[in-house]
Amino acid sequence: MIKGSVKKIETLGLVDGPGIRTVVFLSGCKLRCKYCHNPEMWKLTELNYTPEELAKRIIRNKPYFKRNNGGVTFSGGEPLLQSEFLIEVCKLLKKENIHIALDTSGVGNGNYEEILSYIDLVLLDIKHVNPEKYQELTSHNIDESQKFINVLNKSKIPVWIRQVIIPGLMDNNEYLYGLKKQLQKIKNIKKINFLPYHTLGKEKYKELGIEYPYKNLDAMDKEKCQKLYENFINILNKD
């Protein structure tokens, strides 16, 4: 029997896809992003749900989805790591015509084509566009995420881009032009979000006995992040 590791489930989510959403956080992630605010989700913990149990819990919220064009978003951690479990849950949800979004960095264990056959929207997290910087930031190489993007490009699934802006690393024109070049390789982009780096995860690191890599780095100013986004849109519109 397939079982999955679900860290938490949030209802009434408003930022992880269209409408009101149930957000399911699946445990496990290969990346060790220096700015990660959910280090408690890195490891696969107890297998606490069958596909049927999780689907039943999500389907309970279907009346809310219908009123607001919402649905479910699988996040993490990295939901692609639990590919077999994710596929089985999605099969059950599709029978109920529930909109399914996938919040991912694109670093899983394969089965991407089958997973994406059930997905209505991909929220794609861009860690860094430079392979060396990506490795430094995540402790993982960039190749696996590119494999996922290659499969994603063969689909017609709409994509929302999410880019965390870390002060001193992404808040410059050199990075913005590199990001433009990277996004030109990704099809069906419908939205781009710049997310200001925050320090809300620091306490979690203390509780887990892990040193926080960016302990001396201040949060990204929200107004500066918005101006950077506006600058990026201008760069995108240039020839």
Language-model segment annotations:
Residues 39-68, 72:
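Conserved alpha-helical substructure of the radical SAM core
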